Amino acid sequence: MHIHKIQAREILDSRGNPTIEADVILTTGIIGRASVPSGASTGSREACELRDNDPKRYAGKGVQKAVKHVNNEINQALQGLSVEDQENLDRILCQLDNTENKSHLGANAILATSLACARARALSLNQPLYMTLNQGDMMTMPVPMMNILNGGAHADNNVDIQEFMIMPIGAPDFPVALQMGTEIFHVLKSVLKKQGLNTAVGDEGGFAPNIQSNRQALDLLSEAIEKAGFRLGEDIVFALDVAASELFNEGFYHMYSENQKFDSHQLIEYYANLISSYPIVSIEDGLDEKDWSGWKQLTTHLGNKVQLVGDDLFVTNPKILREGIAQGVANAILIKVNQIGTLSETRQAIKLAYDNGYRCVMSHRSGETEDTFIADLAVASGCGQIKTGSLCRTDRTAKYNQLLRINELASLPYAGKNILKR
């Protein structure tokens, strides 16, 4: 299981922007391959995504510098090492970079290598990736958080909240959950058409119409769920990604489509009213990533009612999560491998969350590739929830299809309503 060579290339992500793909070639000839995604709505403390900044090429978004780092320094440092010891490989990658935010080699270069090593190991063992990624956690098939109505930075419309998601918690298993979500997605399209609303899709495959308010978005989803023959609150519940850092300006949160602005306390009351009107079970990034006093209020007021997920707040960083746990901020963390940059550090964040009673939600990015690593990691870690977009665009459905394959291979329970237990 020793590394013969590591090589990288520039490929395109789902938005048509360059990203990096790495091949880890073992002495046996086995090739582990991984590519990395890119976010649009990003936390300020995420690990550094290295771009070329050459305006003459891909509008400055090329990743040839990161590719060269893989082909040169990283290749030289890892040649001859075994992929059996993931922590050692990731430690060497971090030491080689030697910056707090991986800005020297680039988190994209480091992550592509880290994940490709893990995949090479699975191939060497002739085992499915989810099995080799499992570290003793009870594996489950995750509840998909299906982002079928898009706004914010993920869509070119006037909707403030970034993601309106449906969660088929009442399904008996993952394939039925996927079927339920897909049927609702198609019914929603006809509901939108009937009302003369746009049915073009956003970056993550959800519809992105111009509508009058966040409540209207939830009403449209409610109508689609009912018309598809499912029970709102029993079969299907809602989750929101507010991405509030994108709405925060000069001390206030601006809901532009509703012509309203709120301070932290008022926005918490706004959420409380939404929760009393709709079966919302999860709110992600409900406040700005720097508004920690507001987050404490939010957690005190709503933390016993809904899942409060920190994305921009924690950026999959164990150090920042530790601060949040100490201060009683949020009760769940979004897991995005490219926010931290190695598989080992991602695992550390997951373990820290579990050890302190925080939930984990595995997540894609808005700029994705066909790589399905996060589907396997969601199952392996037993996190019970996954965000990987809507029910169209191959970059999104690739992850759902991988989960179907895993479900076929393994007799694993579907997380379902267990995610609601507090």
From Swiss-Prot:
Listed cofactors: Mg(2+)
Native organism taxonomy: Bacteria, Pseudomonadati, Pseudomonadota, Gammaproteobacteria, Legionellales
Subcellular location: Cytoplasm; Secreted; Cell surface
Protein name (Swiss-Prot/TrEMBL): Enolase
NCBIfam families in the record: eno
One Pfam family here: Enolase_N
Cofactor stoichiometry and binding remark: Binds a second Mg(2+) ion via substrate during catalysis.
Pathway annotation: Carbohydrate degradation; glycolysis; pyruvate from D-glyceraldehyde 3-phosphate: step 4/5
First-listed, main subcellular location of the protein, grouped into a coarse class: cytoplasm
Binding site for (2R)-2-phosphoglycerate: 162, 336, 365-366, 387
Gene Ontology biological-process annotations: glycolytic process
Family: Belongs to the enolase family.
UniProt keyword list: Cytoplasm, Glycolysis, Lyase, Magnesium, Metal-binding, Secreted
Disulfides per UniProt: none
Record: residues binding Mg(2+): 241, 284, 311
